Amino acid sequence: MSALDNRLFAKMNGIGNEIVVVDLRDQPAPVTPDDARAVAAHLPYDQLMLLQPARLPGTEAFVRIYNNDGSEAGACGNGMRCVARQMFASTDKQGLTFETRAGLLNCWRGPADGLYTVDMGEPKFGWKDIPLAEEFRDTRSIELQIGPIDAPLLHTPSVVSMGNPHAIFWVDDIEAHDLGRFGPLLENHPIFPERANITLAHIVDRDHITMRTWERGAGLTRACGSAACATAVAAARLKRADRVVEMTLPGGQLSIAWRESDNHVLMTGGATFEFEGRFDPALFARSRDKTSA
């Protein structure tokens, strides 16, 4: 029996990032990686957001996040906006706090209808915090390239942790490189012991960046909120962009503000409800049968 048997789910998207939200606050039984993969086989998604019973006072829930390959993610900005949208629909509160593997995340109703703001916390830059497999004193750019040594296709990325590892390659044209080909190679590069999200980014102006992301554990995605935060921060660290920027992703726009007062990164964007349904227990029974076989 799975904790997801007959459970109600909401299919949503955060500017194109495919999200499934399940409220399990009345269900302490764990959801397994096999369960997460079984859902993905039936209902394709980028992230599965599971609301589990709160573990800390003042929080609404512990949010466990699965990628579609069954691996866990510490943070998912687009997914958290979807969770916030669902929760705000049943409360008059202006702000909500959730616990994730990456720490506490605060969410607010945004500056306009349909927009939500998530405090993604403070970025980390130390090589052990990202983490990297070897020491780099300056993570604004590290020695990593793909392609010929004398003419690399991609090289010297910036690396940042937003509760999950990110590598950002600065390019003139984000469509000129086959991210579907290079993404998995870079995600699984030995320099990243926990794998990494891989982003191609182009700085249009000091307040505007375009980007595409190969998401760790999910693949090519139309949007990755934590990658947008990491990219904005990395550009500001290089002094090539301001601390408040508009990010253009294949799925839409995000506003990112790297606050000077506490170094927290605030992400504002939309969240769309698509439909709801219930999981068929047979879905998870088939998964268990395959595993036991």
UniProtKB/Swiss-Prot annotation:
One of its GO terms (molecular function) is diaminopimelate epimerase activity. It is found in: Cytoplasm. The record marks 166, 215 as: Could be important to modulate the pK values of the two catalytic cysteine residues. GO terms for biological process: lysine biosynthetic process via diaminopimelate. Pathway: Amino-acid biosynthesis; L-lysine biosynthesis via DAP pathway; DL-2,6-diaminopimelate from LL-2,6-diaminopimelate: step 1/1. It comes from the Bacteria. Keywords: Amino-acid biosynthesis, Cytoplasm, Isomerase, Lysine biosynthesis. The active site is at 76 (proton donor), 224 (proton acceptor). Substrate binds at residues 17, 47, 67, 77-78, 164, 197, 215-216, 225-226. Pfam families: DAP_epimerase. The keyword GTP-binding does not apply. This is Diaminopimelate epimerase. It comes from Rhodopseudomonas palustris (strain BisB5). The gene is dapF.
